[in-house]
Amino acid sequence: MSVAFRRDSDEEHLEPKFEIPIPAGPNMVTQRGLALIQAKVAELEAALPLIEDEAHIVATKRDLRYWRARQATAQLAPAADGDIVEFGCSVRFRRNGKEQLVTLVGHDEAEPASGLISFSAPLSQALMRAEVGDFIAFGGQEDAIEILAITATDRS
């Protein structure tokens, strides 16, 4: 049948709606990350009954599925002691003569511009298990990063 004879409401011609991709691997979270996920689920659940636009309802339901899945699979990481770099730690280091501070967090909590980087990011992986005073290879350079300080973040 010709497209001219189809109703405008046929969903066949709509752009496909994809689910939000869930990062591979474990869903490690800090206490803050778990609280953020729980708050997002509560926010979406509260907003859903108030939405009137069908497209917005569909998008909100999709978002809610994502955040409920993240909440259901969240694994609260054990508290770090700050002796070595591990999930949840803040790390101050020197790279290319510049000092930086990052905190290793879960995927959903990551905000690189704020210094919160995902534990699966290449920089995080390079830093893992390092100790103060260690020099680490990164970006194809030996001794590219010097670990200056490690701080265990509050998980309560």
Where do the protein language model's features map onto the residues?
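Helix-rich terminal scaffold detector
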Residues: 1-70
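Amphipathic alpha-helical coiled-coil segments
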Residues: 65-81
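Short, compositionally biased
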Residues: 148-156
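Short, Lys/Arg-enriched charge-dense amphipathic segments
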Residues: 3, 15-16, 21-22, 27, ...
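Non-DNA-binding regulatory cores of transcription-related proteins
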Residues: 78-148
